[in-house]
Amino acid sequence: MKHTLSVLVEDESGVLTRISGLFARRGFNIDSLAVGPAEKAGISRITMVIRGDNRIIEQITKHLYKLVNVLKIQDITNIPCVERELMLIKVKTGENKRNEILEIANIFRARVVDLSESFIILEITGDPGKIAAIEKLLEKYGICEIARTGKIALTRESKINTEILRLNTMINNDKIRGGGT
């Protein structure tokens, strides 16, 4: 199972090296890693996705807390949260495929950031499912390059799961169109 950990650390030189060294020594793999400044000066937030059962995640957490600059660790896997990734994707295009690709981009609210006779580069932001879906749809056109950030996430204060919000929106949209009761 994939787990998402949110780790607050002091913004000091070598912190990320010590964390990645710990993972390497223990034989753990990091699927996704994103690091950036947190809400407080001098503090960074690391969002990492790791594969493992609860026992492995507990073990990783204990080892991380032993590192000097680690302040707080939270496994947010089963907590309602907002998750986002950013992907830049370069796709082969020609005059006959361009409109189809632009239509897909429009549906996914992707932005065209570069366009030439032979290629198009799109910028897509969304949850990991949205990113995977557009990538899958664009495969048939010929993906040349992909650059993807790691997942970033913050817990929801409303404690409402994204899937519940999405389902509720679909039901309400259906009622507006006259399909509901």
From Swiss-Prot:
Presence of the UniProt keyword tRNA processing in the record: no
Family the entry assigns: Belongs to the acetolactate synthase small subunit family.
Subunit and interaction comment: Dimer of large and small chains.
EC number: 2.2.1.6
Keyword Oxidoreductase part of the UniProt annotation: no
Domain of life: Eukaryota
Enzyme superclass (EC): transferase
Cellular component, GO, one term: chloroplast
Domain ACT: 4-78
Gene: ilvH
Gene Ontology molecular function: acetolactate synthase activity; acetolactate synthase regulator activity
Keywords linked to the UniProt accession: Amino-acid biosynthesis, Branched-chain amino acid biosynthesis, Chloroplast, Plastid, Transferase
Organism: Galdieria sulphuraria
Protein name (database record): Acetolactate synthase small subunit
Recorded metabolic or biological pathway in which this protein acts: Amino-acid biosynthesis; L-isoleucine biosynthesis; L-isoleucine from 2-oxobutanoate: step 1/4; Amino-acid biosynthesis; L-valine biosynthesis; L-valine from pyruvate: step 1/4
SUPFAM superfamilies reported in the protein's UniProt record: ACT-like
Gene Ontology terms: biological process: isoleucine biosynthetic process; L-valine biosynthetic process
Pfam families to which the protein is assigned, alphabetical: ACT_AHAS_ss, ALS_ss_C
